[in-house]
From Swiss-Prot:
Transmembrane segments: none
Pfam families: AAA, Prot_ATP_ID_OB_C
Location(s), subcellular: Cytoplasm; Nucleus
GO cellular component: chromatin; cytoplasm; cytosol; nuclear periphery; proteasome regulatory particle, base subcomplex
Similarity remark: Belongs to the AAA ATPase family.
Natural source organism: Schizosaccharomyces pombe (strain 972 / ATCC 24843) (Fission yeast)
GO MF annotations, alphabetized: ATP binding; ATP hydrolysis activity; proteasome-activating activity
Function: The 26S proteasome is involved in the ATP-dependent degradation of ubiquitinated proteins. The regulatory (or ATPase) complex confers ATP dependency and substrate specificity to the 26S complex.
Keywords tagged on the record: ATP-binding, Cytoplasm, Nucleotide-binding, Nucleus, Proteasome
Binding annotation for ATP: G175, P176, P177, G178, T179, G180, K181, T182
Entry's Gene Ontology BP terms: proteasome-mediated ubiquitin-dependent protein catabolic process
Protein name in UniProt: 26S proteasome regulatory subunit 6B homolog
Length: 389
C-alpha cells in the first residue's frame, strides 16, 4: 500500500470519527428532547384529568360549528357555544349525544355513553316477574290475543312472512283498574326470552324542556340495540291524551313527547323484533293518531264485568295455594255479581286470610270470606267502574 492510499484511508477514518461524534451529540439532544416531551405529555395528561375531574355538568350536543367549537344544551335549558377538548373523537359527537361540560368554562370535555344519564333500564333475567299465564285467572280471549300479537311474531315470525302479512307493531290493553292488564303483561315478560323494558307514562314528563322526547328516543334505541325486545308503557294516557291548543309550556312539552312517541313508532321497521305494549284505564281520552292502524294495530279490552265462568276461574286461581276449610263454598261468592275485577277478588281472599291469621287459625273459614266480602265490596263499586266505560 502506497502513501497516497494510506492518507486517503486516514482521512476517511477521521471523517467517520467526526460523523460518529456528531451522531452521538445529536443522540444526546434527541434524548433530552424526548425527556422534555415526556414531561410535557405528563403535564398535558394531568391537565386533561384536571379538566375532566368531577363534578362535571351534563349537557346535550346539538351542533358542531367547526373542529374546535360546538353548540351544546345544558340541563337548565340554555344553549352555549363552547370549545371542544382536542383529545375527543369528533366522530362520536352526534346530535343529541350526552356530553360532560367543564363546570367553570362549560368546555366540552367528555362524551358520555348513551346509557350514562338514562333512567330507562331493562329487566335482567333474574329480575323478571314470577307471574305465569296460569296465575292469571280467566281472560282466555285476552291471553290468546296478546300471545298472537306479541309472542308469536317474536318466536315464529316466519309464519307472518310466509302468509305475506306484517305482524302487529303495537298492542293497547284498556279497561278499568284491577282487571288484569299489568298482571298479564308480567306473564308475557316471564314467558318470553325477549328483553323487557317497562316504563310509566308519567316518567317521560321531566322538569326541563327536551328531556321527555330524549327519554322516548332512549327507550326505542335501547330496544333496537337489544332486540328482540318488548316495550311496556303503563298509564300511557299520562302523555297521549287528545291534542289541543296548548296554552302553557307544560302542555306543549307533553304534546312534544307524544309527537316523538308517534315518530318513534313509525320509525322502527317490522324486522326489528321490537313490540310495544301500552296500557290505560281511559282509552277514550287517547289521541286518535296513536290509535290508528300501523301504530297500535291490536286493541284488547279487559271488561270490568266478568261472567260466572270467569269469576270461577279467578277464584280457583287465587285460592289454589290457600288452605280453605272444607265448609267453604266458593259458589256462594261466584254467584254474586258484585265482585267483578280480579284485583277485587284477590283483595277479598287476602283479607279473609288476614282474618284467619288474626284469630290464630290455620285455615280460612266461610265466615272469614263473608266478612272480607262485606268489607271489600261496596254498593258504589259498580258505579265507579262506569267512569271507565
Amino acid at each position: 500500500m502506497n502513501s497516497t492510499e494510506e492518507i486517503d484511508l486516514y482521512n476517511r477514518w477521521k471523517a467517520l470519527e467526526r460523523q460518529l461524534e456528531m451522531l452521538d451529540l445529536q443522540e444526546g439532544f434527541i434524548k433530552e428532547d424526548c425527556k422534555s416531551l415526556k414531561r410535557e405529555l405528563i403535564r398535558a395528561q394531568e391537565e386533561v384529568k384536571r379538566i375532566q375531574s368531577v363534578p362535571l355538568v351534563i349537557g346535550q350536543f346539538l351542533e358542531a360549528i367547526d373542529q374546535n367549537t360546538a353548540i351544546v344544551g345544558s340541563t337548565t335549558g340554555s344553549n352555549y357555544v363552547v370549545r371542544i377538548l382536542s383529545t375527543l373523537d369528533r366522530e362520536l359527537l352526534k346530535p343529541s349525544a350526552s356530553v360532560a361540560l367543564q363546570r367553570h368554562s362549560n368546555a366540552l370535555v367528555d362524551i358520555l355513553p348513551p346509557e350514562a344519564d338514562s333512567s330507562i333500564s331493562m329487566l335482567r333475567p333474574d329480575e323478571r316477574p314470577d307471574v305465569s299465564y296460569a296465575d292469571v285467572g280467566g281472560l282466555d280471549v285476552q291471553k290468546q290475543e296478546v300471545r298472537e300479537a306479541v309472542e308469536l311474531p317474536l318466536t315464529q315470525g316466519d309464519l307472518y312472512r310466509q302468509i305475506g302479512i306484517d305482524p302487529p307493531r303495537g298492542v293497547l290493553l284498556y279497561g278499568p283498574p284491577g282487571t288484569g292488564k299489568t298482571m298479564l303483561v308480567k306473564a308475557v315478560a316471564n314467558s318470553t326470552a325477549a328483553n323487557f323494558i317497562r316504563v310509566v307514562g308519567s316518567e317521560f314528563v321531566q322538569k326541563y324542556l327536551g328531556e321527555g322526547p330524549r327519554m322516548v328516543r332512549d327507550v326505542f334505541r335501547m330496544a333496537r340495540e337489544n332486540a328482540p325486545a318488548i316495550i311496556f308503557i303503563d298509564e300511557i294516557d299520562a302523555i297521549a291524551t287528545k291534542r289541543f291548543d296548548a296554552q302553557t309550556g307544560a302542555d306543549r312539552e307533553v304534546q312534544r313527547i307524544l309527537i316523538e312517541l308517534l315518530t318513534q313508532m313509525d320509525g322502527f321497521d317490522q324486522g326489528a323484533n321490537v313490540k310495544v305494549i301500552m296500557a290505560t284505564n281511559r282509552a277514550d281520552t287517547l289521541d286518535p293518531a296513536l290509535l290508528r292502524p300501523g301504530r297500535l294495530d291490536r286493541k284488547i279490552e279487559f271488561p270490568s264485568y266478568r261472567d260466572r265462568r270467569q269469576r270461577r276461574l279467578v277464584f280457583q286461581t287465587i285460592t289454589a295455594k290457600m288452605l280453605l276449610s272444607p265448609e267453604v263454598d266458593l259458589d256462594t261468592f261466584i254467584m254474586r255479581p258484585d265482585a267483578s275485577s280480579g284485583a277485587q277478588i284477590a283483595a277479598i281472599m287476602q283479607d279473609a286470610g288476614l282474618l284467619a291469621v288474626r284469630k290464630s287459625r290455620g285455615v280460612i273459614l266461610q265466615s272469614d270470606i263473608e266478612e272480607a266480602y262485606a268489607r271489600a265490596v261496596k254498593p258504589t263499586d259498580m258505579e265507579q267502574f262506569a267512569f271507565y266505560k
